[in-house]
UniProtKB/Swiss-Prot annotation:
Domain notes: The 9aaTAD motif is a transactivation domain present in a large number of yeast and animal transcription factors.
One Pfam entry name: HMG_box
Name this protein carries in UniProt: Transcription factor Sox-17-beta.1
DNA-binding region: 58-126
Stated role: Transcription activator. Doesn't appear to bind to the consensus 5'-AACAAT-3' DNA binding site, but binds 5'-ATTGTT-3'. All of the sox17 proteins are required for embryonic endoderm development and gastrulation movements, and show some redundancy in function. In addition, the sox17 proteins have distinct but overlapping roles in later gut development. Acts downstream of vegt-signaling in endoderm differentiation to induce a range of endodermal genes both directly and indirectly. Also represses wnt-responsive genes to inhibit wnt/beta-catenin-mediated signaling.
Assembly notes: Interacts (via C-terminus) with ctnnb1/beta-catenin (via Armadillo repeats); this interaction is required for inhibition of wnt-signaling.
Entry's Gene Ontology cellular component terms: nucleus
Effect annotated for changing residue 93 to R: No effect on ctnnb1-binding
Sox C-terminal domain sequence ranges: 256-373
Keywords: Activator, Developmental protein, DNA-binding, Gastrulation, Nucleus, Transcription, Transcription regulation, Wnt signaling pathway
Motif 9aaTAD mapped to chain: 323-331
Length: 373
């Protein structure tokens, strides 16, 4: 073997000396290379200046421990060459504490002499502690050598990881909850049974001047024609959302005795109207079940007369709180969207008067509901 590099170094040197200058000489960007060569001496000069400043810096006078440890450290380093400097410092500290005052006295006197000499040499000296270099500490924190429990500043990397994990967990939990929830606007107003009947098909029984009480509600065919015509597209959602409420209301209405309609009448006219309305909606055959839940017109008239007489006497006004039943109301009819039912006393036929605003409102709602689906 003639050479350790098998002759490759000679070829590289030839190529570097011949071919590279020929190729790079054609371009102008090769000229500033000389600038980098000029920077090297300046860098060396800067390091030399820093060294001279470090050497010219005035050092503090040594104390008694430093005077004793100066020679003792060298001796321990020779005896234990494998020990780190930190371990040597720990051993020196323990040894210094174990020494007696008589043994420490010569080192204390030497430290006092050095202090007096330092004052004489540098009368204007003022101790200025050097700033701690943060470069190494920051580098160690980035590398993760320092534990986060002892050094709060080293929690940067850990916090980033923890924040990312928490964000992922919260984001996944939110997505899971959003996937389980129904579409937006599904539960708006579904707390009550008659949400879709609220504006259009809720009857309002008015006391006519000729009659002395409330008129009986119309037949169920008219209810179905009014209620289901506006909201036929929402029936699947309504059945799913209002099944428990309807079952509860059906149970309440079925438990009311049929032979005593005064029980629901004397409490409040609104309770009577709601019970009659729920019983109508719960039954599918209007003609077969109308007579069971609605008493005859004469009996209703008698009940209404008794109720109005008691209201005029003022016996029930102090005992009944009218606002108590507001929390049980399942619908809130609007004043301008009411359907007024009246009875012709001569013919006994029902007549309905739809307000003009009802027709326009119904058309708008049907259009927006269809577009919203």
């Amino acid at each position: 073997m003639s050479s350790p590099d098998c002759g490759y170094s000679s070829d590289d040197q030839i190529q570097g000396s011949c071919s590279v200058p020929m190729m790079m000489g054609q371009y102008q960007w090769t000229e500033p290379l000389t600038v980098f060569q000029d920077l090297k001496p300046k860098r060396d000069e800067g390091s030399a200046d820093s060294r001279s400043k470090a050497e010219g810096r005035i050092r503090r006078p040594m104390n008694a421990f430093m005077v004793w440890a100066k020679d003792e450290r060298k001796r321990l380093a020779q005896q234990n060459p494998d020990l780190h400097n930190a371990e040597l410092s720990k051993m020196l500290g323990k040894s210094w504490k174990s020494l007696t005052l008589a043994t420490k006295r010569p080192f204390v006197e030497e430290a006092e002499r050095l202090r007096v000499q330092h004052i004489q040499d540098y009368p204007d000296y003022k101790y200025r502690p050097r700033r701690k270099k943060q470069v190494k500490r920051m580098k160690r924190e980035e590398d993760g050598f320092l534990p986060s429990a002892n050094f709060p500043g080293s929690q940067i990397m850990d916090n980033n990881v923890m924040v990312g994990e928490n964000y992922r967990m919260q984001y996944s939990a939110q997505n899971h909850q959003q996937n389980q929830l129904p579409p937006a606007g599904y539960f708006e107003g579904h707390n009550s049974m008659g949400y879709y009947y609220r504006d259009y098909s809720v009857p309002n029984y008015h006391i006519s001047q000729n009659s002395s009480g409330y008129d009986s509600p119309p037949a169920q065919d008219e209810y179905q024609a009014l209620s289901y015509s506006f909201n036929s597209s929402y029936m699947p959602y309504q059945q799913n959302a209002t099944t428990p409420v309807m079952a509860k209301q059906m149970a309440v209405t079925q438990n009311i005795p049929q032979e005593s309609p005064e029980h629901g009448m004397m409490a409040s006219p609104q309770m009577y109207n709601r019970q009659m309305y729920v019983s109508e909606c719960a039954k599918t055959h209007p003609m077969a079940q109308t007579e069971q839940h609605f008493p005859s017109y004469q009996s209703q008239k008698t009940v209404r007369q008794n109720y109005l007489q008691s209201q005029q006497d003022g016996h029930l006004e102090s005992d009944i709180d009218k606002t108590e039943f507001d929390q049980y109301l399942m619908y809130e009819p609007k004043a301008d969207m009411e359907i007024i039912y009246t009875i012709d006393q001569d013919s006994g036929a029902y007549s309905t008067n739809l307000l003009p605003s009802l027709i326009t409102e119904a058309n708008n709602v049907c259009y927006y509901d269809y577009c919203g689906v």
